[in-house]
A protein has these predicted regions:
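Short, acidic Ser/Thr/Gly-rich low-complexity loop/linker segments typical of extracellular
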Residues: 9-10, 21-44
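The canonical Cys-X-X-Cys-His
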Residues: 409, 435, 580-594, 647, ...
Length: 662
């Protein structure tokens, strides 16, 4: 039961996350719930140790350690302390004109400070920097998903079929010339087909990317059309992948030169939702978890490289009509620059942008910020190791009135981070789409500014001086894990272990803590958690206690020995529909729907029919779940046997004909 400290009132709609090794069968080893109107919640999980996270609007985040046993339920009355008013950053909503459809897909600023936005209904609107008045600059575009403004009278928009230059030639504030800048890619009209971007470097070159189409109809086609690339798995089986590069250059990142030349740069991308160019003119792209993409990712894109999803290789001159094997893909694949673990680090990351505000946004100069389809903005701190980028990801702002669908961002001349928000109809937003901005109040946040690799561990640098007790090793916990690279839709964590801290110390600068770990291994994601309530020497609490460092490489001089840390196997428990509910929501509900009646568009069946799939025995259904069928991917290598049994138990209990919902 959740109650507010002080008045004892129940806390409703709090987000709760239970995480631990006993939930290895669940994505990211965690279950999620919301508290009811009376503040009550319940988790049913196997015996073992767990971390319980409680996140509620207006209250301080809370993490508890819970030990579950077989014969004794754990009952807790939990008091939540009211959160202090955010002292460092606040979220504000930008007023939009009533006649605008607020499905805002991109934002940018012109050199004169005008705010420029597109919506997915094909409009471009501009808010003047001087008077703050909105005007509709252009309309009739096809799902504009990116915008840049080279001048106060010219706007470039990436719509699905082309990049369009919009020019106001007579000074009346409305575009009267629409010019095609580039259209050198294929399209099919598939409902799941997107053109992502738009980013511009200092030389005026433009950058973007194309997502895969989904299985289904291709009502019309521009350019060549090709079937999915067949990649046999190591066991010789031919897998199914509903996301395919059927039109030319789907799954690619591209550049358009200033003269309009279209240049495909690199492939291996599934849904490159976020495209950004750094202050050094380097291209970074985020990708969304799915087949061949184990979790959300950030890539540093280099021409000619391959990033994981093989279907776009069919458009590469060296791979046209050439057989591709799984072993070839493993050797070619460039690992992600940064892994963004699903859950605490969002679900579908958006456009990366860099703090170049000259101190107007706080202490994070030069660092990267990424929005997400959830109400989260992440921060990324990169470093180069052996000439290759890798680094740490942190939660930056979560909640605080932030809306969902914030997948395109831009820093304004006022130093605020502006966020375009739309979810394109995938889910209810309760009227929350539009534009918001994150504003620095001028108060310095207490945060982990840098998380950097060392030869024997890591160094954490805080934004403010910290007391001597900050150097104690029992303030911190470190875990490491990996993901599978496979065709299945996402991946669970694997090889997950706690990494003991051998020693720690606070440097004389009072801001940097050195953590020496028992051992260092490359090719792992290291999870850092501050488990003590740290505060600065001024008494201000730490804002974000979690970070994830992607250690593709280690520093020269690091001693790497065979590991002595072994992940423990999890025992198979009896099938539990309560555990299966969470698995269904995370892995199945998008296609099979909350009511279990499926979708004709996607091709999923109706579980509630007396003659539907649930009329078949468990053995048949488990075989289908494991191996996949029609549009459904094989989950046998994504979810352990425990999860398969649990989700089937949930589906039978909830959607069986005897319990069919109206």
């Amino acid at each position: 039961m959740l109650r507010a400290a002080g008045n004892g009132q129940p806390v409703a709609n709090a987000q709760l996350k239970l995480e631990g090794p006993g939930l290895a069968a669940v994505e990211n080893s965690q279950m999620q719930k919301k508290s009811g109107a009376d503040g009550a919640f319940q988790f049913d999980a196997p015996p073992g140790p767990y971390d319980l996270w409680v996140i509620a609007s207006g209250f301080e985040d809370l993490k508890l350690n819970v030990e579950l046993t077989v014969d004794r339920p754990v009952v807790r009355d939990i008091e939540l302390r009211s959160a202090a008013k955010p002292y460092a950053y606040r979220v504000e909503t930008v007023d939009l004109p009533q006649q605008m459809i607020p499905e805002v897909s991109a934002v940018a600023f012109s050199p004169g400070g005008n705010l420029v936005m597109t919506n997915r209904r094909g409009e471009v609107w501009i808010r003047a920097a001087v008077f703050g008045q909105w005007r509709r600059f252009a309309s009739g575009l096809y799902e504009g998903f990116g915008v840049v403004a080279p001048s106060d009278s010219e706007v470039l928009v990436l719509q699905r079929p082309e990049i369009t230059r919009l020019v106001d030639t007579n000074g009346d504030g409305v575009a009267d010339r629409y010019e095609t800048v580039a259209d050198g890619w294929g399209i099919t009209g598939n409902y799941h087909e997107f053109s992502y971007g738009l980013a511009r470097d200092r030389a005026g070159n433009l950058y973007g990317g194309f997502g895969m189409a989904s299985a289904g109809d291709f009502p019309w086609v521009r350019g060549p059309l090709k079937e999915a690339l067949v990649v046999p798995l190591p066991n010789g089986k031919i897998p199914a992948d509903p996301h395919r590069s059927v039109a030319q250059y789907q799954g690619w990142a591209f550049r358009v030169n200033r003269d309009g030349t279209f240049v495909p740069l690199a492939t291996g991308l599934r849904q490159p939702l976020g495209v950004g160019v750094s202050p050094q003119d380097e291209l970074f792209v985020t990708d969304v978890s799915g087949a061949w993409v184990p979790t959300s990712l950030l890539h540093h894109i280099e021409a000619g490289s391959f990033y994981g999803h093989p279907d776009g290789l069919k458009w590469h001159p060296d791979f046209r009509d050439k057989p591709v094997t799984y072993d070839m893909l493993v050797k070619m694949r460039r690992p992600p620059t940064v892994y963004l673990p699903r859950g605490l680090m969002g679900g579908s990351p958006g456009q990366p942008v860099w703090d170049t505000t000259g101190g107007k946004f706080g202490p994070y100069a030069g660092q990267m910020f990424i929005g997400d389809v959830t109400n989260l903005v992440m921060r990324v701190d990169l470093e180069k190791v052996e000439g290759v980028y890798q680094g740490a990801a942190f939660p930056f702002v979560r909640g605080q009135g932030l809306g969902i669908g914030g997948m395109h961002n831009a820093f304004g001349p006022d130093g605020a981070l502006y966020i375009a928000e739309t979810v394109r109809g995938w889910m209810s937003t309760e009227g929350g789409e539009g534009i918001q901005r994150i504003v620095w109040t001028g108060e310095n946040p207490v945060d982990i500014l840098h998380l950097r690799l060392a030869t024997r561990g890591f160094a954490l640098t805080f934004t403010e001086p910290m007391p001597a007790t900050t150097g104690k090793s029992d303030n911190y916990r470190v875990r490491r894990f990996r993901y599978n690279y496979h065709i299945q839709d996402g991946s669970l964590r694997r090889d997950e272990v706690d990494v003991p801290i051998k020693s720690s110390r606070l440097r004389e600068d009072q801001r940097t803590v050195e953590l020496e770990l028992q051992e260092m291994q490359p090719d792992f994601i290291y999870e850092f958690e501050v488990i003590a309530p740290l505060a600065s020497t001024k008494g201000r609490p730490l804002l974000n206690p979690v970070a994830y460092y992607t250690a593709n490489r280690l520093l020269p001089g690091t001693v790497v020995a065979p590991t002595t840390l072994i992940a423990k196997a999890v025992k198979l428990q009896p099938a539990d529909p309560r555990r299966g509910e969470q698995i269904y929501k995370l892995n199945c509900m998008v296609c099979h729907q909350p009511d279990g009646k499926g979708s004709k568009q996607v091709g999923t069946p109706d579980y509630t029919l007396p003659t539907g799939p649930l009329s078949r025995p468990d053995s048949d259904l488990l075989a289908v779940i494991m191996a996949g069928k029609n549009q459904m991917p094989a989950f046998g290598n994504v979810l352990p046997p425990q999860a398969l049994h649990d989700v089937l138990a949930y589906v039978r209990k909830t959607f069986g004909p005897q319990t069919a919902r109206p």
